[in-house]
Amino acid sequence: RKMRAVLRYRHIPHDWIVRGSTHDDLPPAPVPVIPVLGWRDDEGGYREVMVDSSPQITRLETDHPQRSIVATDPATAFIDFVLEDVADEWLSKAMYHYRWANAEDTEKSGRLLPLDANLQLPADKAAMAHDFFIDRQVGRRAMIGSTDANGPVLERSYERILDTLQAHLAEHNFFFGTRPGRADFAFFGQLMPMLWWDPTPTAVAVERAPRAIMWNQWMDDLSWWRVDDDEGWCSAEAIPPTTRALLVEAGRTYAPFMVANAAAVAAGADEVACETDGTEYRQTPFKYQAKCLAWIRDEYAGLSDADQARVDGVLGGTGCEVLVAT
């Protein structure tokens, strides 16, 4: 949903194809994940396919300059890049946890997801797919971080994010001005299942953040939202307090995990162990998330000294300083 929303908002012509459907003519992706973007050649085939939403967004910015989702202020753009990763690599853990750690949520997804690519799937095959989906996804919980011990950490983080969004959306439509950025679409993408699909987190959101639920519906298709060239971005110094509050949340959860995970990957360790939200957090090391931290540090290194100082001023006191520490 994240990338489809980006394409819609940016008015980029595209065909959206359900993977595994009879219309799926995409070649194999480099790794079996979604979304996959494919660029057609002159003969109707594909000259290139690409996975991973963050590099996809960067590539689209190069190919299509209109209705950009990258702020003109480099310091703001960097903070936006960080919050995009917070959603993609931390909030995703809560999404996975709520869906596959609760019986009601698990059963709903197990019954419905097999029908996504084929509404006419025979009942016996749907039943087999139901069991396969549940067994596979529940079996991956520990790899994602959704253990019984970590569950309360993920749930409290989700609740605080909802509370922050409820306060933020009382005054602002987006995180960095009057137009959406990378992080807006990333939070939308991870929140969509929790706000509109899975029963347990949806009930929490109805109680705590009704504004976030309706914002999420907006974000799905912002093709109607008007923007004027490169106008509408705030400077790093003018980032709303509620946007900064998301950085504070990241500083108590996402940031210590990302740093510990990168260290565990570098050391070849079998487990990540760190303190998040005042509680011990453990999970299997994740090589991709170590790469994400390296990307953040590369982006920071590419800023001018002046813009690095401005970023430091925003991150100072949030706990996210460790992301760019050398």
Question: What is each stretch, according to the model?
Answer:
Residues 88, 162-166, 220:
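Structural signal for well-ordered, non-membrane alpha-helices
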Residues 93-96, 100, 171-174, 200, ...:
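Intrinsically disordered or highly flexible coil/loop and linker segments, enriched in small
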Residues 1-124, 175, 195, 253-326:
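GST-like domain detector, emphasizing the conserved glutathione-binding G-site
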